[in-house]
Each structure stands twice: as C-alpha cells, then as structure tokens.
Amino acid sequence: MELYDLVKYLVNSFESLGIKYFITGSVASVYYGEPRFTNDIDVVAEIEESQISGLLKFFPEQEFYVNEETVRDAIRNKKLFNIIHPASGLKVDVIIRKENAFDNNRFLRIKRISPIEGTLVNISSPEDVIIMKMKYFKEGESEKHIRDITSMLKISGDSIDRGYVEKWAEKLNLRDIWKAILMKIQSDF
C-alpha cells in the first residue's frame, strides 16, 4: 500500500461512517508546497464513541494495528490515536477535534479537493497548516516544519491570507516565529 492509497482508503472509511475530518500536516503541506517524503498522514477528526466499532471494521487487525482502548481514550480525552499499516510502515495520526476557537475555525475553513483521481478529500486550509506547523515548531523546534512553511509560502504565497495567519499567530503566541519566517522568505528572494 502506498501513501495515497491509504489516504483514499481513510477518506472513504471516514465518509462512509459520517465522520467529520480534514487532512493536515505533511500531506497538506506537500499539496500546497513542494513534494517531500512522508510516511504518515495527519487527520483531525470528530469521532463519537458510537462510531468505534464501525471504524475498527474498516481497519481489521489482519491488515492494520488500531488499539480499541487507545481510540476510546483519545475520544474521551481529546487526544490522538494511531492507525498503523505494518506491511507498508505507513501510519495515520488521528487527532481528535478539540472544542476551542481555533479548531472550530479550522473546520469552517476546510477545502474540498481532488488530489487523487476519483477521490474528493477534505484538507486543511493552507493558513491553518502554516499555523499548526508553527505550533509544532514551537513545541519541538524541528526544522522540517519551517521548511514546509517556507515551501508553502513560495509556491502558494499569493493565495495565502497572511492577515489570517498573523491574527492567529498573535492569539496563539506564535508571532515571533511568524516574523522570523517572513524575514527568511524575504532574504531568500
């Protein structure tokens, strides 16, 4: 199984179960920016406990590793759980939607795209991908997040609402990171 096969399968599974979701993280940043290798899919989802059995049927233990108790705990505590495809080494990080202004806003700004022939996918807006990548950089200082952001700004820069990014960077205490990224972009040109 290839990454985009798993994206397609995940999307079809979630949509069949009526799970609200959007793809974010590296898969989204690659869509808006430059290609790079990734073996994981980040998806934010609104999953109810009543949907767990259906979810597990779509990801049977013969092919996937999904721990039911971890799923249940993630839903109750608004955390994340993994779906792993051991044969390919691919992993899905399912991040349970939090009830806060930013997550609520992200769900309102979902883009519906067709990156895979014959499949429509809900994907995070580029601005929200940038904001989350800044947040992850602040938490762990991995340069890949900065590279992803600069790539997105170079490729999709004209279509990115920088005012929106600035507003949330201010609210989420990411202003200094955003300013440093903008200075880096200007010095690269």
Identify the meaning behind each predicted range.
Residues M1-F189:
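Compositionally biased terminal segments of proteins
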